[in-house]
Amino acid sequence: FIRRFKDNNLVPTLCDAPNLDPFGACRVCSVEVALEKNGVLKTLASCHTPVSEGQHIYTSTETVKTLRKNIIELVLTDHPLDCLTCEVNGNCELQTVAAQVGIRNVRYPEGDNHLYRMKDLSHPYMTSDLSKCINCYRCVRACDEVQGEFVLSMYGRGFDSKIIKGLDASFMESDCVSCGACSQACPTSAISDVFQSKAIQATDTTRTICTYCGVGCNLEVSTNNGEILSIRAPYDAEVNQGHTCLKGRFAFQFYDHPDRLREPMIKKNGKFEVVTWKEAYNFITKKLI
């Protein structure tokens, strides 16, 4: 029943996404449920608990508030606290949820962590920084459920578990098709696209349709003074449901390329000449007739 509460910001989430199946990895969405009024309360993960008749759902009891705060504190003990210099500062779900549950400091002492993990900068459009991974599985599920490529997987167990590409290769050495579904799904910047940080500078977001093929994928284009900064796929689009391909997401720099044709042209005496749209349509009509 998380879908009923998420739009109202009553229940925070980290491992849930609108285009992914419920998973229950983070437990940040926990709520208390009773089968009758003033009945015995049971703490459940709201992302994969179905709504049933007679339920009494409590989203903001002191118990669940404390639980959520403890979970986020534990997550932050193994996460870089470099928000001010992070590429997704201001556009990070973990940052948003931490503020929502009231985190101001972490009570737990510093211990073993994964902050030493190196970045993967092999891909021209995406970066991977697993020191910021919170093991929510969203990237793995996006690769599996949305794109169907099964490139990403979880390797190891317990504290040593980590996301790998292929057989623990780099992005470019793996079978990644560069769709960017994982970067859009990631709630931190463990996997991010190189344009994601620029979206914060956007002054406008425009809903449009991709022109690369005839599928008609919906896109959300972030711009600043007419310059395209980044592109995301909206989750509420009926056609592509929060997904798009490599071209739709990353190949937008053609729009202001100097080689792009901006006016109709007709070949006259072996050379292309700029004409009006009326002349171009008349030319096409004559050819069709």
Give residue ranges: language-model regions.
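N-terminal cofactor/phosphate-binding cores enriched in small/glycine residues
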Residues: F1-E53, E62-L67
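N-terminal export/assembly segments and adjacent metallocofactor-ligating motifs
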Residues: F1-R4, L35-V40, G54-H79, L84-I289
